From Swiss-Prot:
Gene from which the chain derives: nuoH
Protein known as: NADH-quinone oxidoreductase subunit H
Coiled-coil ranges from the UniProt annotation: none
Keywords, comma-separated and alphabetical: Cell inner membrane, Cell membrane, Membrane, NAD, Quinone, Translocase, Transmembrane, Transmembrane helix, Ubiquinone
Pfam family, one: NADHdh
Alphabetical list of PROSITE patterns matching this protein: COMPLEX1_ND1_1 (PS00667), COMPLEX1_ND1_2 (PS00668)
Function: NDH-1 shuttles electrons from NADH, via FMN and iron-sulfur (Fe-S) centers, to quinones in the respiratory chain. The immediate electron acceptor for the enzyme in this species is believed to be ubiquinone. Couples the redox reaction to proton translocation (for every two electrons transferred, four hydrogen ions are translocated across the cytoplasmic membrane), and thus conserves the redox energy in a proton gradient. This subunit may bind ubiquinone.
Enzyme class: translocase
Assigned GO CC terms: plasma membrane
Membrane topology listed for this record: Multi-pass membrane protein
Catalytic activity: a quinone + NADH + 5 H(+)(in) = a quinol + NAD(+) + 4 H(+)(out)
Annotated organism of origin: Ectopseudomonas mendocina (strain ymp) (Pseudomonas mendocina)
InterPro entries per the UniProt record, alphabetical: NADH_UbQ_OxRdtase_su1/FPO (IPR001694), NADH_UbQ_OxRdtase_su1_CS (IPR018086)
E.C. code: 7.1.1.-
């Protein structure tokens, strides 16, 4: 097998790693539905799903079978091509955003020098999915939900980007591995960039349209918003894409502010995946806890909060960080 050169083997191993990691992220996103319902039931002092399998563990399998056999219906008044394209973009954008996150020193999909910029590009692409879904459905509730979503996402993506500029200024690189290595030799960025972390976390919740920033799909006001005409696997792609977004934002918080795969104080460096998974699971639980504990504000309050609170806080954090970096360089 002379054609099996070392270069080809290296490419095949890299492709296999990418497939395994992305499939694992999709499976985690699907399983989060069950985890969320069990945790919400626990926190709200009720049972939650407990009928299908031991402790309700097969509930997600039952849901997937039900979703698979539902009618894949497209409204006759919809723009069919864009209607079908929207959930694909929503799912693919969040999955591709995870590709730049290093899980361990040797495991990751892509090691890009412009990793953070690639994440911003994928986050911006997800806005098109929501707009396409609302416009192509030819439904007033879907259109209102998509307009809300686009305005909210574009607003909070400004702070999502600005919150990370303090980290980039200190490290001097957009590469995610460089950021993790910097934190291994210095303080985790949760301490010097605490305000940047707070803003990034708030913006991350808003960009994923999670409670309390789930205005685009507010059931009481918009009858599920831009999802209203979707059913079956198309709705399932939106559904899983939202949970993949939670996993992606949680993993980014760990990578950018909590040392990535490193344990606290250099503890047990032999198990990098354990530390990464543990910290990511913690932030996923925080996402779920927000749904269980915080009421949904009005849409105007959400937008006012973004521009009147998040923007000044982010700019002050960026100015102070820039001044300190310049002072240290002189």
């Amino acid at each position: 097998m002379n054609w099996l050169t070392p270069e080809l083997i290296e490419i095949l191993v890299a492709v296999l790693k990418a497939i395994v990691i992305l499939l694992a992220v999709v499976v985690c996103g699907a399983l989060l539905s069950f985890v969320e319902r069990r945790l919400l039931g626990w926190w709200q002092d009720r049972y939650g799903p407990n009928r299908v399998g031991p402790f309700g563990m097969f509930q997600i399998a039952a849901d997937m079978i039900k979703m698979f056999f539902k009618e894949d219906w497209t409204p006759p008044f919809a723009d069919r091509f864009i209607f079908v394209l929207a959930p694909m973009i929503a799912f693919a954008a969040m999955l591709m955003a995870f590709a730049i996150i290093p899980i361990t020193p040797t495991w990751g999909v892509a090691d890009l020098n412009i990793g953070i910029l690639f994440f911003f590009a994928m986050a911006g692409l997800s806005v098109y999915a929501v707009l396409f879904a609302g416009w192509s459905s030819n439904n007033k509730f879907a259109l209102l939900g998509s307009l809300r979503a686009s305005a909210q996402t574009i607003s909070y993506e400004v702070f999502l980007a600005l919150a990370l500029m303090g980290v980039v200024a200190q490290v001097g690189s957009f590469n995610m591995r460089d950021i993790v290595d910097y934190q291994a030799q210095n303080l985790w960025f949760i301490i010097p960039q605490f305000f940047g972390f707070c803003t990034f976390f708030i913006a991350g919740v808003a960009v994923t349209h999670r409670h309390p920033f789930d205005q685009p799909e507010a059931e009481q006001e918009l009858a599920d918003g831009y999802h209203i005409e979707y059913a079956g696997m198309k709705w399932g792609m939106f559904f899983v894409g939202e949970y993949v977004g939670i996993v992606t934002i949680s993993a980014l918080l760990v990578t950018l502010f909590f040392g990535g795969w490193h344990g606290p104080f250099g503890l047990l460096p032999q198990i990098p995946f354990f530390w990464f998974a543990l910290k990511t699971a913690f932030f996923i639980m925080i996402f779920i806890l927000l749904r269980a504990s915080i009421p949904r504000p009005r849409y105007d309050q959400v937008m006012a909060f973004s521009w009147k609170f998040c923007l000044p806080l982010t700019l002050i954090n960026l100015l102070v960080t820039g001044a300190l970096v310049l002072a240290a360089a002189q």
